[in-house]
Amino acid sequence: MNHLNKLMERLGHQFNNLELLKIALTHRSSGADNNERLEFLGDSVLGFIIASELYQRRPQAREGDLSRMRASMVNGDELAQMSTKLGINEYLQLGVGEQKSGGKRRRSILADALEAIVGSIYIDAGLETCRRCVLNWYGERVDDLSKLSPKKDAKSLLQEWLQARRLPLPTYEVKITGEAHAQTFTVNCYVKGLPHKTEGVNTTRRRAEQIAAKRFLELLDDGKGDGITERDQ
């Protein structure tokens, strides 16, 4: 019995070309034939599928709201959680160094692998099969799309807060540490003329910026950060 059969059962698709799934599970630290190209494709396919569902289910929503709702569905945290739920982490092929550093639990690797699998299903069986799989993974969240609230991210809210008061836009200073396969991003956020300075630390630059922006808002107005998401944009 092929060791990938259980995973294919969870994914809801039996691959015609099993090599596509194997590549989708192979991180760049493991060798040259890795999942980066499939991830690139899968990112676009996944975004299209969710955008299409939102367009159909939210006919009155504005473009900006649709974009924010899509972002909440395909951000790194959401994809990493889904990847773990599907058990993709159990099948990842990583280099020795990446394995030792806990790569099978790393959010970015899990999210990238899920996108690569989306790309592999799209190539293997086409858009409709891929759509069916993706919507099945999201489960009840798909049904909730018609009720989804378009929350703004912290960076957008901070920019709006400053613009409303005719203040300069924030500056985000980024410091990168660690090896290429395990980088840490430290972002400092400040606004010229204001005394505050906040820091956000994460394994992705975008999320570190969101964390720093959320903390800055909380300093500007106690409670301002309530309900603000720190998701990737």
From Swiss-Prot:
- In Gene Ontology terms, what is a biological process of this protein? tRNA processing
Record text on subunit structure and interactions? Homodimer.
* One of the record's GO cellular component terms: cytoplasm
Describe the reaction catalysed, as an equation.
Endonucleolytic cleavage to 5'-phosphomonoester
Q: Which residues form the DRBM domain?
A: 153-222
Instruction: Indicate what this protein is called per its UniProt record.
Output: Ribonuclease 3
The domain of life for this entry's organism is Bacteria
Q: Cite the InterPro entries for this sequence.
A: dsRBD_dom (IPR014720), RNase_III (IPR011907), RNase_III_dom (IPR000999), RNase_III_sf (IPR036389)
Q: Where is the active site?
A: D43, E115
Its Enzyme Commission number?
Answer: 3.1.26.3
Cite a single GO MF annotation: metal ion binding
Q: Name one Pfam family in it.
A: Ribonucleas_3_3
Compartments (UniProt record): Cytoplasm
Q: Identify the coding gene.
A: rnc
Question: Principal localization?
Answer: cytoplasm
- Give the enzyme's main class according to its UniProt record, as a single word: hydrolase
Ranges for the RNase III domain?
A: 4-126
Function comment: Digests double-stranded RNA. Involved in the processing of primary rRNA transcript to yield the immediate precursors to the large and small rRNAs (23S and 16S). Processes some mRNAs, and tRNAs when they are encoded in the rRNA operon. Processes pre-crRNA and tracrRNA of type II CRISPR loci if present in the organism.
The entry sums up its family as follows: Belongs to the ribonuclease III family.
**Needed co-factor(s):** Mg(2+)
User: Quick one: which residues bind Mg(2+)?
Assistant: E39, D112, E115
Q: Which UniProt keywords apply?
A: Cytoplasm, Endonuclease, Hydrolase, Magnesium, Metal-binding, mRNA processing, Nuclease, RNA-binding, rRNA processing, rRNA-binding, tRNA processing
